[in-house]
A protein has these predicted regions:
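Short active-site-adjacent helix-start/loop capping segments
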Residues: 11-12, 30
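Internal "kinase-insert"/substrate-recognition segments embedded within catalytic cores
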Residues: 2-10, 17, 21-25, 44-49, ...
Length: 138
């Protein structure tokens, strides 16, 4: 689940972050793979979100053990590269329920061909066109 500190009162944050993701690791019997992956990426100089562990309780009821992960957004970009301008895509598979995957393969010049595999989260302008140009160059 995601906690958005600005959802009801604008300007709120926790440790200067507007959002945090709580991942329950239901597919990871060790509960540590995600955090280790982010730590290895950081050690290798690869941009990665900050992560930690938390034992979560809600109104006194234990909810379980979670990996808490920084939201990939403009704040992450500003902290990581000193610039929050430009395009931010969430790449994955089956956003639209089909067989499309975010493989960075050129699919054609129609932006609709990319919308099931990529989710444009942030852009200044021409986000889809720049993604198409990027895949064409590969």
């Amino acid at each position: 689940f995601k906690v958005d500190f600005n959802r009801f009162i604008s300007g709120q944050s926790y440790d200067l972050l507007k959002k945090l993701n709580f991942n329950n690791g239901f597919k990871d019997p060790t509960f540590v793979r995600e955090k280790i992956f982010y730590d290895v990426c950081e050690a290798a100089g690869i941009l990665s979100p900050r992560a930690t562990f938390a034992e979560v309780t809600f109104n006194g009821t234990p909810w379980g053990f979670y990996t808490v992960v920084e939201q990939i957004d403009d704040q992450f970009l500003d902290r990581s590269i000193g610039d929050d301008e430009g395009h931010l895509f969430k790449a994955g598979s089956n956003f639209g329920g089909g067989d499309d995957e975010a493989s960075l393969v050129y699919l054609g010049s129609d932006t609709v061909l990319y919308e099931n595999a990529y989710d444009l989260k942030q852009t200044e302008s021409n986000g889809w066109e720049d993604l198409i140009d990027f895949t064409l160059a590969g």
